[in-house]
């Protein structure tokens, strides 16, 4: 009878260790990748674009985003460099997309359309190392 209890205890301990290991592996695999809004911008009407530039930071912050790059120097390695480059970081691709699709941002992106030529992308980033 004592041997049966030891075997049962061993099986239970092994099962708990297995569940704990599987949970740890799953939590590593379930890491949320950051999301980025990336824009190439050529401002055609600086005065109107300034109105957009003043309003957009509040919409970004509302979705947990922050600027990684906002203008500044650009050096071309291959191809033509954009006049202005912007990278905005979010906690996830979904948060970045939610910002882009939000009514807050939707209310002002027409200002950008009227004052600049741009290409804007939402991309999923790599996990932090």
Regions found by a protein language model. Give the residues of each.
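Short S/T/G/P-rich N-terminal loop/turn motif that feeds into the first structured element of a domain
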Residues: 5-10, 14-103, 124-129
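Short arginine-rich
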Residues: 105-122
